[in-house]
């Protein structure tokens, strides 16, 4: 599992990016966020996640808020 901080997340569009220290930013879609109810992330929030290869490159999967 990787760890990072949410760079930004757009609730209306349902996606954003996670900053990884020493690495490239990783795309995150709301469907990758674990948990119940409305799935969103806050700027600066710490998360753990896996990186998978999506249609447009690397993206976050199994995102857990820390």
From Swiss-Prot:
Name this polypeptide is given: Cold shock protein CspB
Lineage: Bacteria, Bacillati, Bacillota, Bacilli, Bacillales
CDD domains: CSP_CDS
Main location, first listed in the record: cytoplasm
Tree of life domain: Bacteria
SUBUNIT field: Homodimer.
Annotated Pfam families: CSD
Cited PROSITE patterns: CSD_1, CSD_2
Cellular localization per UniProt: Cytoplasm
Keywords: Activator, Cytoplasm, DNA-binding, Stress response, Transcription, Transcription regulation
């Amino acid at each position: 599992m990787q760890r990072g901080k949410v760079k930004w997340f757009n609730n209306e569009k349902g996606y954003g990016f996670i900053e990884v220290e020493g690495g490239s930013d990783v795309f995150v879609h709301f469907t990758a966020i674990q948990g119940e109810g409305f799935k969103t992330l806050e700027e600066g929030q710490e998360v753990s996640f896996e990186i998978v290869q999506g249609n447009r490159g690397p993206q976050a999967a199994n995102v857990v808020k820390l």
